[in-house]
From Swiss-Prot:
Name of the protein in question: Longitudinals lacking protein, isoform G
A Pfam family that the UniProt record links to this protein: BTB
Chief localisation class: nucleus
Function, in words: Putative transcription factor required for axon growth and guidance in the central and peripheral nervous systems. Repels CNS axons away from the midline by promoting the expression of the midline repellent sli and its receptor robo.
Residue ranges of domain BTB in the record: 32-97
Species assigned in the record: Drosophila melanogaster (Fruit fly)
Length: 891
C-alpha cells in the first residue's frame, strides 16, 4: 500500500517565475526567434510568448515555417509596440493617458489578450507586409505559395475586396477601409438599395473560398448565365434578384466562357454598361491579384492593396461612363435600381474571376482595352480580351465547350459573330497567310534567279558588247603593247625603279624580250588583233598570252557571257561555222562557258576576248614562230608537271615541226652565232631540274625560316597555262584547224566560232591534273576549300599546298626516314635544312652560322651580259624587274 502512495509537488510561484524568465530572456535577446518592426525599429521576441498572448500571432505563426520571421507592423508606432511587448512579457505596462487610445487600438488590431478580448469593431488591423525573410533578404526554402495565401488570409484585409475573413479569430472583427471604398463606389452608381452590402459580402466570401481551394479561375455559372441570356433590360433585374437569392454557389465556369457570354449580352444597355465596367475592373485586379499571390514581402501586398483602392475609385468613373454610353435607355427596365445593382454585382464577379489571370494576359488586355468596347445606338459589343491568348485559349477550351451546351442557338449565333472580332478579322488573317506564302515563293524565285549552277558565273557579266567596241578601240592608244607606248615605258623605267606588272604585260614583255634579244624573227602585219575586255589591251596574234589559273582566272572567268548571248551574237552577225573542227568542239562541249563578241572595224578586225582565256596565234601556219616561244609555251603550259615531261614535250614539238627547227637554225646563222632563245630556255629548264634535285637543301616549308621562306613557294610558271598550238594537247584537227581557217581570210564570225570552240576545249580538258599523263606527284590531286590546288602524297595520303613541300615530304619525311641534317656543333639532327639553320641561329648564336642556300628561282644568263629572272607574287601575277642596263632581276 505504501508503494501506491504518491506525492504532489507544487511550484507555488510557477507562473511568476516563468514570466520573469521570459522577461530576462527578452532583455538578453536569448532564444529569440522572431522580429517585430515598426517605424524602422526592431524588437526581437519569442514565438511562444506572442502566440500565448495573441490568437492573431498564434494563427500567423502556425503558417510560418521560417526559422526567424520578421513582421513589419504598419500603422503601429514603435512606442506602442514597445508598450505591448512589456504588457505581454510582464503583465503590466505604464502609459500616459494621451497614448492610451492609440495603444488600445493597436492592441485590438493585434488581438492582444487582456486589451481586446471584450472589444468588437472599429479598429484597423495592420498587416505584416513581409513575413518569411530576414532583414538582409534571407528567404526560407520551405515557404510555399499556398502557405503564403493562407497566411495572408489570416492577416485580414489583404485583398482589396476582402470582407470579414477573420471568423476563426477570437473576439475580433476586422472591418477594413476597402469595404468603405467599395460602398462609396456603389453609391456613385446610384444603387441605393440594400442589396449592395449582401452582394459585396457574397463576393468577398467567394474570393476567400477561391483562394483557399486554389481554384483561381472559378466563378459563378449562374451569374454569368443570367448576365448573358437577358435580351431585354428587364433581364438585369431578374439577374440581380437571382444573384441575391443564390450568391455564388457554382464554381465551374472558366474565364473564357465568361468572356464569350459577356459578348452575347448586347440587347440591354444597362447590362452592357455593367459588363463594360466589369471587364475594366477585371484588368485592374488581374495585376493586383497576380502581384499579391507572387509576393512574399507583405509590404508589397499593402502597397498593392492601396493601389487597388485607388483603382476602384478610377473604376467608379468608368462605370459612370458606361452608363452614359448607354444613353437615356439605360434605366428603362422595370427596375432601374435592380439593374444598377446587377451591374455592380457583375463587376465584382468578373473582378474576382480575373484576379488570378497571369500577368502577361493582363498586359495584353490592357493594350486592347480602349478598342474593346463599341456602341452603336443602344447596342454594346464587348470583345473578349483573351481571344488570341495562346495560354488562356489552351487552358480553357474544354470548359468552354461544356458551357456552350447550356447556351441557346440564338446566343451561339450572337457569340459566333463577335468572338473573332468581326467578319474581317479571320478573313484578313487568312489573306495575310496567303500573301506571306506568295512572298516566300517570290523570294525563293528571286534567289534562284540570282543563283547560278556554275561557280565561275556568279559575278556580274562585264564583258563588252558590240556597242562598246568603239570604246575598246579608243583604248588602243593606252595599251602597253603598242610600239610607242612600249618605248616610252622603257624610257620611264629608271635603273633603280621597280614596277609590278600584270600577267598579260609580263607575258608580252617576256616574248618581246625573246624576240628583240635573240635571232631576228620576221613579223608580218596581222589582219586581226585581239582586245582584252577587262583592260582594253591589244593582243598581237604572235603574243604569248598567259593565264594565271589560280588567280586571275578565278577573278575574270565570271566576266564572260552566257550561252544565250553567244547565240544572239552569232545570229546577228550571220556567222559561219569554221569547218569540222568548230563543229566537233561545239558537240564535244555543247554548253559554252566562255564566249566573246566581235565587231567589224573600218581599219582592222578586232576580237574582244577575256584575259582569262588562252589565245593562240591566228597565223601560226603562215608565219614561222620562233622555237623559243614554243618552248616557253610548253614550259608555262606544263607548269603543273615535272620538268622531265617539259623536256619531253620540247622534243615532241621539235619532231612535229621540223621546218621550224630549220628556220630557227637559219636565223641563228644570220644572227652571227648569237645564243638563241632556245638555248636560254633549255638552260632555264636545266637549272630548274637541278634545283629540284637539291630541293631538300634549297626549299623549306613556309613558316620555318624567314631566310629560306621564299624557297618553299611554288614556281612562277606553275600558275601559267598556254594553249598548245601544234595540236599536241587537243589534236591536229581541233585547235590548229580553227586557226588555219582564220589565217586564210576568215571573217569576224569565223574568229568568234573558232575562239569559242577553242576555249570550250581548253576549259574542258585543262582541269587541275587533267592533262597529266602519268599520275605524277607534282600535279595537284584535287581542289581545297579555298579553291587552291591540293597535292596529296601517294604513299601516306598527306596533303600539301605547295608541290615543293610535297617533294620535300616524300624525300625527307615519308616512310619514317631518319633526320639527315646534322648540326656541326651538337648531336641535333633535322630532317630539313631550314630547321637546322633555325636551330643554329637559336642555340649557337656565337658560332659561325650555316651558309645560306637562297638564290633566285629562275635566272637566264647571256654571254653578252644580258640576264633576267622572273618570280611570282603568289597571287596569279608575275613580277619582272628591269634596270637601265637591260637586265632582268628577281624581286
Amino acid at each position: 500500500m505504501d508503494d501506491d502512495q504518491q506525492f504532489c509537488l507544487r511550484w507555488n510561484n510557477h507562473q511568476s517565475t516563468l514570466i520573469s524568465v521570459f522577461d530576462t530572456l527578452l532583455e538578453n535577446e536569448t532564444l529569440v526567434d522572431c522580429t517585430l518592426a515598426a517605424e524602422g525599429k526592431f524588437l526581437k521576441a519569442h514565438k511562444v510568448v506572442l502566440s500565448a498572448c495573441s490568437p492573431y500571432f498564434a494563427t500567423l505563426l502556425q503558417e510560418q515555417y521560417d526559422k526567424h520571421p520578421i513582421f513589419i507592423l504598419k500603422d503601429v508606432k514603435y512606442q506602442e509596440l514597445r508598450a505591448m511587448m512589456d504588457y505581454m512579457y510582464r503583465g503590466e505596462v505604464n502609459i500616459s493617458q494621451d497614448q492610451l487610445a492609440a495603444l488600445l487600438k493597436a492592441a485590438e488590431s493585434l488581438q492582444i489578450k487582456g486589451l481586446s478580448d471584450n472589444r468588437t469593431g472599429g479598429g484597423v488591423a495592420p498587416k505584416p507586409e513581409s513575413s518569411g525573410h530576414h532583414r538582409g533578404g534571407k528567404l526560407s526554402g520551405a515557404y510555399t505559395l499556398e502557405q503564403t495565401k493562407r497566411a495572408r488570409l489570416a492577416t485580414g484585409g489583404a485583398m482589396d475586396t476582402s470582407g470579414d475573413v477573420s471568423g476563426s479569430r477570437e473576439g475580433s472583427s476586422s472591418p477594413s477601409r476597402r469595404r468603405r471604398k467599395v460602398r462609396r463606389r456603389s453609391m456613385e452608381n446610384d444603387a441605393h438599395d440594400n442589396s449592395n452590402s449582401s452582394v459585396l459580402q457574397a463576393a468577398a466570401s467567394n474570393q476567400s473560398i477561391l483562394q483557399q481551394t486554389g481554384a483561381g479561375l472559378a466563378v459563378s455559372a449562374l451569374v454569368t448565365t443570367q448576365l448573358s441570356s437577358g435580351p431585354a433590360a428587364g433581364t438585369s433585374s431578374q439577374a440581380s434578384s437571382t444573384q441575391q437569392q443564390q450568391p455564388l454557389t457554382s464554381t465551374n465556369v472558366t474565364k473564357k466562357t465568361e468572356s464569350a457570354k459577356l459578348t452575347s449580352s448586347t440587347a440591354a444597355p444597362a447590362s452592357g454598361a455593367s459588363a463594360s465596367a466589369a471587364v475594366q475592373q477585371a484588368h485592374l485586379h488581374q495585376q493586383q491579384a497576380q502581384t499579391t499571390s507572387d509576393a512574399i514581402n507583405t509590404e508589397n501586398v499593402q502597397a498593392q492593396s492601396q493601389g487597388g483602392a485607388q483603382g476602384v475609385q478610377g473604376d467608379d468613373e468608368d462605370i459612370d461612363e458606361g452608363s452614359a454610353v448607354g444613353g437615356p435607355n439605360s434605366a428603362t427596365g422595370p427596375n432601374p435600381a435592380s439593374a444598377s445593382a446587377s451591374a455592380v454585382h457583375a463587376g465584382v464577379v468578373v473582378k474576382q474571376l480575373a484576379s488570378v489571370v497571369d500577368k502577361s494576359s493582363s498586359n495584353h488586355k490592357h493594350k486592347i482595352k480602349d478598342n474593346s468596347v463599341s456602341s452603336v445606338g443602344s447596342e454594346m459589343v464587348i470583345e473578349p480580351k483573351a481571344e488570341y491568348d495562346d495560354d488562356a485559349h489552351d487552358e480553357n477550351v474544354e470548359d468552354l465547350t461544356l458551357d456552350e451546351e447550356d447556351m441557346t442557338m440564338e446566343e451561339l449565333d450572337q457569340t459566333a459573330g463577335t468572338s473573332q472580332g468581326g467578319e474581317g478579322s479571320s478573313q484578313t488573317y487568312a489573306t495575310w497567310q496567303h500573301d506571306r506564302s506568295q512572298d516566300e515563293l517570290g523570294l525563293m524565285a528571286q534567289d534562284a534567279q540570282q543563283r547560278d549552277p556554275q561557280d565561275l558565273s556568279r559575278k556580274e557579266n562585264t564583258a563588252p558588247d558590240v556597242a562598246s567596241t568603239a570604246e575598246i578601240q579608243r583604248s588602243f592608244q593606252r595599251s602597253i603593247l603598242n610600239g610607242k607606248q612600249r618605248d616610252e615605258q622603257k624610257i620611264q623605267l629608271p635603273g633603280s625603279r621597280r614596277k609590278r606588272l600584270s600577267v598579260t604585260e609580263v607575258s608580252d614583255m617576256l616574248f618581246e624580250f625573246y624576240k628583240t634579244k635573240s635571232a631576228k624573227v620576221p613579223k608580218a602585219e596581222q589582219p586581226h588583233r585581239q582586245v582584252s575586255p577587262t583592260s582594253g589591251e591589244i593582243l598581237d596574234p604572235s603574243t604569248i598570252s598567259a593565264i594565271a589559273v589560280y588567280g586571275t582566272a578565278s577573278e575574270t572567268a565570271s566576266k564572260n557571257l552566257n550561252a544565250d548571248e553567244v547565240m544572239r551574237v552569232q545570229n546577228a552577225t550571220a556567222t559561219r561555222v569554221v569547218g569540222a573542227a568548230a563543229g566537233a568542239a561545239a558537240s564535244f562541249h555543247p554548253r559554252p562557258k566562255y564566249t566573246l563578241k566581235t565587231a567589224a572595224s573600218s581599219t582592222e578586225h578586232t576580237t574582244a576576248i577575256p584575259t582569262s582565256v588562252l589565245v593562240a596565234n591566228s597565223a601560226a601556219a603562215l608565219t614561222p614562230k620562233p622555237q623559243a616561244a614554243v618552248i616557253a609555251e610548253a614550259l608555262m603550259r606544263n607548269g603543273l608537271h615535272n620538268f622531265q615531261q617539259q623536256l619531253r614535250a620540247q622534243e615532241i614539238l621539235r619532231q612535229q615541226t621540223p621546218h621550224r627547227r630549220i628556220k630557227e637554225e637559219n636565223d641563228v646563222e644570220i644572227a652571227g652565232g648569237d645564243i638563241t632563245p632556245t638555248k636560254i630556255l633549255e638552260n632555264l629548264l636545266r637549272k630548274q631540274q637541278e634545283r629540284d634535285l637539291r630541293h631538300s637543301e634549297c626549299e623549306n616549308e613556309p613558316g620555318y625560316s624567314t631566310e629560306d621562306d621564299e624557297e618553299g613557294r611554288y614556281h612562277a610558271f606553275d600558275d601559267i597555262h598556254l594553249m598548245e598550238q601544234s595540236g599536241g594537247k587537243f589534236g591536229n584537227n581541233s585547235g590548229m584547224g580553227m586557226f588555219n581557217a582564220n589565217a586564210h581570210g576568215g571573217s569576224a564570225s569565223s574568229i568568234l566560232d573558232a575562239h569559242q570552240a577553242f576555249r570550250n576545249l581548253e576549259f574542258t580538258l585543262s582541269d587541275y591534273g587533267g592533262s597529266s599523263s602519268n599520275g605524277s606527284t607534282t600535279s595537284p590531286n584535287g581542289i581545297g576549300l579555298d579553291g587552291e590546288p591540293v597535292y596529296e602524297c601517294r604513299h601516306c595520303g598527306k596533303k600539301y599546298r605547295w608541290k615543293s613541300t610535297l617533294r620535300r615530304h616524300e624525300n625527307v619525311e615519308c616512310g619514317g626516314k631518319e633526320p639527315s641534317h646534322q648540326c656541326p656543333y651538337c648531336p641535333y639532327k633535322s630532317k630539313q635544312r631550314g630547321n637546322l639553320g633555325v636551330h643554329v641561329r637559336k642555340h649557337h648564336t656565337d658560332l659561325p652560322q650555316l651558309p645560306s642556300k637562297r638564290r633566285s628561282k629562275y635566272s637566264m644568263n647571256r654571254e653578252n651580259g644580258m640576264s633576267g629572272s622572273m618570280s611570282d607574287d603568289s597571287q596569279g601575277k608575275l613580277i619582272i624587274d628591269f634596270n637601265g642596263k637591260g637586265e632582268l632581276e628577281t624581286k
